[in-house]
Structures are given as C-alpha cells and as structure tokens.
C-alpha cells in the first residue's frame, strides 16, 4: 500500500440467504432490502477515506468466489469483513480458506436496541 494514496479496501458483507424474503409486505420491507440499506451506509462511510471494492452482499458460495476473484483482481490492500446479521458460517469459512493472504479487519457491530416489531 502506498501511504500517499487512499487504501483500497475490499468490503465483505455477509448476509443470511434464508432470510432474504423475510419481511415481505411489511412497512420496513424485506430483510434483503434492509440489509442493502445498511450496506450502503457502510460503503458511504468507508468511501470517505478509502477506495472501496464491493460486489454486493455475500449470501452463498458463488458470491464468495466472485468476491474473492474481484478482491484478487483489484489487488485490495485489506478486507473489511462483517456479518450484517446472523448468517451461516460456510461463506466465512470458504472466504478464509480461499482468499489469498491479506489483512482482514473483522467487525461486529453491537446495536443499543433492535427496532424489530414486525418481520
């Protein structure tokens, strides 16, 4: 990484495939639409200080491989990884197994409260 330029950060945001349609027809929308909004907030914030490499929320094995290929092609300096909610571990395990060596910053956001009333 050149210290005079912005870092190139790969964003690995993991979601739960089984929840994608959950919440359909509710005022807050589906799980997927809510997680897309959350992802957008993280991308905007990171975009203030880094060049972001992102190819969407990772839900399944094919998403993991596509994301790894993109991160490798773009030569990311590091990866920011985060579960957007509970999700199966297989995507994370495949990422750790198959991603070439790169610094990984794992984040776990703890919310003060959950506003879930209707899913």
Question: What is each PLM-predicted segment?
Answer:
Residues 2-119:
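Metallocofactor- and cofactor-centric catalytic cores in central/energy metabolism, strongly enriched
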């Amino acid at each position: 990484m050149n210290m005079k330029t912005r870092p190139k950060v790969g964003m690995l945001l993991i979601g739960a495939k089984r929840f994608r349609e959950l919440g359909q027809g509710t005022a807050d929308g589906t799980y997927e639409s809510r997680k897309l909004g959350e992802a957008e907030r993280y991308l905007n914030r990171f975009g203030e200080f880094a060049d972001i490499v992102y190819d969407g929320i990772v839900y399944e094995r094919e998403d993991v491989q596509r994301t790894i290929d993109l991160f490798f092609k773009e030569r990311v300096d590091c990866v920011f990884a985060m579960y957007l909610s509970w999700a199966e571990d297989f995507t994370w395990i495949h990422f750790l197994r198959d991603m070439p060596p790169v610094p990984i910053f794992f984040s776990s956001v703890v919310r003060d409260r959950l506003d879930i009333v209707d899913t």
